[in-house]
Regions:
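Regulatory sensory and allosteric helical modules in signal-transduction proteins
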Residues: 62-70, 78-134
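Regulatory loop-to-helix N-cap segments in sensory/regulatory domains
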Residues: 155-171
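Sensory beta-strand/linker motifs that couple input domains to effectors
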Residues: 145-156
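Residue-level recognition of short loop/turn positions
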Residues: 107, 144-145
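A short, aliphatic-rich beta-strand micro-motif
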Residues: 135-143
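Short hydrophobic/aromatic beta-strand element in the GNAT-like acyltransferase core
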Residues: 56, 101, 138, 151
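Intrinsically disordered, low-complexity terminal regulatory regions
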Residues: 1-95, 171-173, 183-189
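Hydrophobic recognition helices of helix-based DNA-binding modules
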Residues: 177-181
Length: 190
């Protein structure tokens, strides 16, 4: 497998390079993750959405090819209707240049965007126009080897004052889930 890093737009790299992508892909496959939806991770995302009151919650396990939501909670009806009359539905896969999780993975720390519009770097992201995302809260899933496996995140179509309580909650949930995912290492392969 090869990983093609993103190309810069002028001098600004809008999506950070993911140097750990090949190692992460190998680690996720060893854990039996990242290739299919996981009902337990869907349930985790649902609980996270309930806890935060956000309409979207995800467990994102990106690999060399893009992002994959192994755990996903979305509203039954898309809360945004685009100007063309279509209500977009967030699926399980997104390109690397969509959304904010790739930034969490590259930074290796949580990202709080209370109003995406306040940040020029993020305001032009495709998920803002396509899904109406206006706020984001995400934290990395870091395993015991120090590798970022992915992210735990929530998003809303309204600006949200996540504040310190939101940041603390997302980081705690990410840490708990990382331990749970790592326990798969001792399980036999599928």
């Amino acid at each position: 497998m090869t990983y093609d890093p993103p190309r810069p737009a002028g001098r600004l790299l809008l999506t950070p390079e993911d140097k750990e992508a090949p190692a992460r892909t190998r680690r996720l496959r060893r854990l039996g993750l990242g290739e299919r939806p996981e009902p337990a991770l869907d349930a985790f995302a649902h609980r996270l959405a309930e806890l935060t009151g956000a309409p979207y919650a995800m467990v994102n396990l990106p690999d060399e090819h893009g992002q994959f939501y192994a755990g996903l909670f979305v509203p039954a009806v898309a809360p945004v209707v685009r100007s063309d009359g279509i209500s977009p539905r967030l699926g399980r896969a997104l390109p690397r240049d969509h959304g904010f999780c790739p930034h969490v993975v590259a930074r290796r720390k949580a990202l709080v965007l209370e109003d995406v519009g306040d940040y020029p770097r993020f305001a032009g992201n495709p998920v803002v126009d396509e899904f109406g995302i206006r706020s984001y809260l995400g934290a990395p899933l870091i395993d015991g080897t120090g590798l970022v496996l992915g992210t735990v995140s929530v998003a809303d179509i309204e600006p949200r004052p996540w504040g310190k309580p939101g940041l603390t909650a997302i980081k705690e949930h990410a840490a708990l889930l990382a331990v749970e995912l790592e326990s798969r290492d001792s399980l036999p392969p599928y």
